[in-house]
Structure formats: C-alpha cells, structure tokens
C-alpha cells in the first residue's frame, strides 16, 4: 500500500489524473463487474512486481495499466492496438529483459530521469540474438541500432549527445 500511495502521489505531482476506477475497492469492482468488464478483462489497474525474485528494491517495477492492447486487434490493425501503462522505477532498480513478438508501444519518459533501454535484434527465425541490431523510432526519428561487442547497447534518453558520440552518429 505504501508503494501504491507513493506512486499515486508521484503521478498526481505530474498533473496526471487516473480514471475513477483506479480508486474503486474490490467490492465496488464486484458490484460494477458488468460495467467494468473491459477494464477487468484487459487486466488494467495497479501492479507491483518483483518478477518473483523477492528483491523489489533491486529488481522491481510499479505499473498502472490504463489500457492493454489485444494481440488479435493488433494483428488485424484495428480495435485496441496499443497498451498505455505508467511505469515507475526507483533509482538503479532493474527490470529483467523481455521480448515482444508483436507490440505497439511508445515509451515516454515523462519524469525526465535518465532511463537506459537495452535493445537487441532477432535472428531470421525471430529468436533473441545479442549480435543483431534493429530499427527503432525515437521522437519521430528512425534510428538504427547496432549490436557491437564491448559497447553499451542502450540509449540514455533519445537525443543525448553522449549517446550519439558513443555510436558515431551526428
């Protein structure tokens, strides 16, 4: 509850307003189950995870899911094609690597803290390949990322000169 209260305070401090159902009690959800079916089915709401490691302060994440895209909608190009989640990490808190086969996702750093995202490509069969690069759109700019041994593969906030210098980009 402390993590949720702290997160709610932080979210509000940025002028973001959560939907009314964010504050419903379990009994309110039960009484409104039919009305809130889309919210419930999409597994929206509060989530605090330590990824099963039992070390939240080292490896954990707070999430509030506002919308959760459906794979079949994304594949057909209509309906709820994207997810919208508020993510809060503590200083130096890690999130384990994961992959999406198909995902429409924007990562927006609203708080302005330094954020490092490591990106890796796939082999021709779609499997993880730490030697493969890829393409990502960053603030509307197409960026090619290369997997280069010995270099940190990740960006610190798009547009940083240090990243560009490290990668040899203009």
Protein language model features and the residues they cover:
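Glycine- and acidic-residue-biased ligand/ion/polar-headgroup-sensing regions
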Residues: 90-91, 103-125, 130, 138-140
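A short, N-terminal "cap"/entry segment at the start of jelly-roll beta-barrel domains
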Residues: 1-82
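Conserved metal-binding segment of the jelly-roll/cupin
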Residues: 90, 146-170
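Short beta-strand segments in beta-sandwich/barrel cores
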Residues: 85, 93-95, 114-117, 158
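Surface-exposed acidic, glycine/proline-enriched linker/cap segments
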Residues: 132-148
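A short beta-loop-beta micro-motif enriched in histidine and acidic residues
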Residues: 72-83, 94-106, 110-111
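Short, flexible loop/turn elements at secondary-structure junctions
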Residues: 68-70, 90-93, 111, 164
């Amino acid at each position: 509850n402390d993590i949720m209260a702290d997160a709610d305070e932080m979210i509000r401090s940025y002028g973001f307003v959560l939907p009314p159902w964010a504050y419903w009690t379990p009994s309110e959800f039960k009484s409104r189950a039919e009305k809130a079916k889309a919210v419930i089915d999409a597994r929206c709401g509060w989530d605090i995870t330590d990824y099963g490691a039992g070390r939240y302060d080292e490896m954990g994440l707070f999430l509030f899911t506002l919308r959760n895209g459906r794979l079949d909608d994304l594949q057909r190009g209509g309906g709820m094609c994207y997810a919208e989640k508020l993510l809060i990490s503590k200083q130096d808190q890690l999130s384990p690597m994961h992959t999406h086969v198909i995902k429409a996702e924007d990562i927006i750093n609203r708080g302005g803290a330094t954020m490092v995202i490591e990106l890796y490509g796939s082999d021709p069969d779609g499997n993880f390949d730490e030697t493969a690069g890829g393409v990502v759109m960053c603030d509307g700019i197409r960026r090619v990322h290369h997997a280069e041994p010995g270099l940190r593969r990740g960006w610190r906030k798009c547009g940083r000169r240090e990243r560009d210098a490290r990668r040899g980009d203009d």
